[in-house]
């Protein structure tokens, strides 16, 4: 029973780590409760850095790689 629980927990963790994270660059700031003109100035710049995360694998026999032949597209 313990082995099957460990296998189920491992599968749940593996699926959870495989889920993509969606985020967008944005800037939202506010200087709340500023006592004067020169205090509480807020400057924010949204930054978007495209990241290539597909096809970054190294192995000896490339044909046996599960990523072989997959298509990849960058944002």
From Swiss-Prot:
UniProt xrefs under InterPro entries: ChpA-H
GO cellular component: cell surface; extracellular region; pilus
Pfam families membership: ChpA-C (PF03777)
Cleavable signal peptide: 1-23
Disulfides per UniProt: 54-72
Biotechnology: The small chaplin mixture (a cell wall extract of an rdlA-rdlB knockout) forms a stable coat on a number of surfaces (including Teflon and cotton) and emulsifies oil-water mixtures, which could be useful in medical and technical applications.
Residues forming coiled coils: none
Induction trigger: Not expressed while still submerged, accumulates during aerial hyphae formation on minimal medium, no transcript detected during sporulation. During aerial hyphae formation and early sporulation on rich medium, under control of ECF sigma factor BldN. Expression depends on bldB but not bldA, bldD or bldH (at protein level).
Compartments, as annotated in UniProt: Cell surface; Secreted, Cell wall; Fimbrium
Main location: other
Secreted keyword on record: yes
BP terms from Gene Ontology: cell adhesion
Domain Chaplin: 34-74
Gene deletion effect: A double chpA-chpD knockout has no phenotype; a quadruple chpA-chpC-chpD-chpH knockout has delayed aerial hyphae formation and sporulation. A quintuple chpA-chpB-chpC-chpD-chpH knockout has a longer delay in aerial hyphae formation and an almost complete lack of sporulation. The quintuple knockout still expresses ChpE, ChpEF and ChpG. Quintuple knockout chpA-chpB-chpC-chpD-chpH has strongly delayed aerial hyphae formation, makes many fewer aerial hyphae but no effect on viability of the spores produced.
Keywords: Amyloid, Cell adhesion, Cell wall, Disulfide bond, Fimbrium, Secreted, Signal
Summary of the function given for this chain in its UniProt record: One of 8 partially redundant surface-active proteins required for efficient formation of aerial mycelium; the short chaplins assemble into a hydrophobic, amyloidal fibrillar surface layer that envelopes and protects aerial hyphae and spores, presumably anchored to the long chaplins. Chaplins have an overlapping function with the surface-active SapB peptide; chaplins are essential on minimal medium while on rich medium both chaplins and SapB are required for efficient aerial hyphae formation. Chaplins are also involved in cell attachment to a hydrophobic surface.
Family: Belongs to the chaplin family. Short chaplin subfamily.
Protein name listed in UniProt: Chaplin-D
This protein's encoding gene: chpD
């Amino acid at each position: 029973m313990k082995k099957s629980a460990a296998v189920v927990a491992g599968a749940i963790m593996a699926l959870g780590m495989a889920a993509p994270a969606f985020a967008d660059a944005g800037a939202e700031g506010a200087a709340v409760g500023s006592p004067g003109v020169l205090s509480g100035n807020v400057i924010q710049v949204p930054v978007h850095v495209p990241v290539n995360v597909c096809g970054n694998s190294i192995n000896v026999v490339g044909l046996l790689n599960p990523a072989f032949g997959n298509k990849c597209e960058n944002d």
